[in-house]
Amino acid sequence: MKSAVMAVACAAAPGFRGPSAFNGAALTTSAKACSAMKMSFESEIGAQAPLGFWDPLGLLADADQERFERLRYVEVKHGRIAMLAIAGHLTQQNTRLPGMLSNSANLSFADMPNGVAALSKIPPAGLAQIFAFIGFLELAVMKNVEGSFPGDFTLGGNPFGASWDAMSEETQASKRAIELNNGRAAQMGILALMVHEELNNKPYVINDLVGASYTFN
């Protein structure tokens, strides 16, 4: 599990990319493509201070609007999942539900470790239920509203739908930008928690920096 977490960390970090061979002509062509790409997408929500338009991996090279919106859809979804993961990580560190997680395995909620270690404790049937539920949400529930912005999963009967529609376009754009930034921070945050858990079983670095003791698993 440790090697898997580290592999994900390395793959996600631009600094771990190996060098590639190129010549002057290729570099010039790449620079022109990047310049055109920046002009196309620099006004999109999320291209904001302090980094502005930032695409170090070149995922949008020669991309059209459809490609951009697909990547934005994926980014928004991953950001939301990461925010839930951060909230769950912190909640489980301090709170355990009463009762049994699995009677057949004689496993209570209080017995479950936090973080990555929990994956090895969940019974196979439990993991199957989790993945089945995720698949159900992905295929049948969380679908983007056709013709709307990437990440608009508004469903019929949503109690917040009316309040969102009542907002001005400027306020909606601001809310979407805030969500993007929070999601980006959460993706880096949950990855950091996973890596530090595997390194020394001390994921909460801020606690260590300020001298606030805690027991993890």
Swiss-Prot record:
Signal peptide: none annotated. GO terms for molecular function: chlorophyll binding. Pfam families: Chloroa_b-bind (PF00504). This is Fucoxanthin-chlorophyll a-c binding protein B, chloroplastic. The light-harvesting complex (LHC) functions as a light receptor, it captures and delivers excitation energy to photosystems with which it is closely associated. Energy is transferred from the carotenoid and chlorophyll C (or B) to chlorophyll A and the photosynthetic reaction centers where it is used to synthesize ATP and reducing power. It comes from Macrocystis pyrifera (Giant kelp). One of its GO terms (biological process) is photosynthesis, light harvesting. The lineage of its organism: Eukaryota, Sar, Stramenopiles, Ochrophyta, PX clade. Belongs to the fucoxanthin chlorophyll protein family. PANTHER family: CHLOROPHYLL A/B BINDING PROTEIN. It is a multi-pass membrane protein. InterPro entries: Chloro_AB-bd_pln, Chloroa_b-bind. The chain crosses the membrane at residues 81-101, 122-142, 183-203. One of its GO terms (cellular component) is light-harvesting complex. The gene is FCPB. Keywords: Chlorophyll, Chloroplast, Chromophore, Light-harvesting polypeptide, Membrane, Photosynthesis, Photosystem II, Plastid, Thylakoid, Transit peptide, Transmembrane, Transmembrane helix.
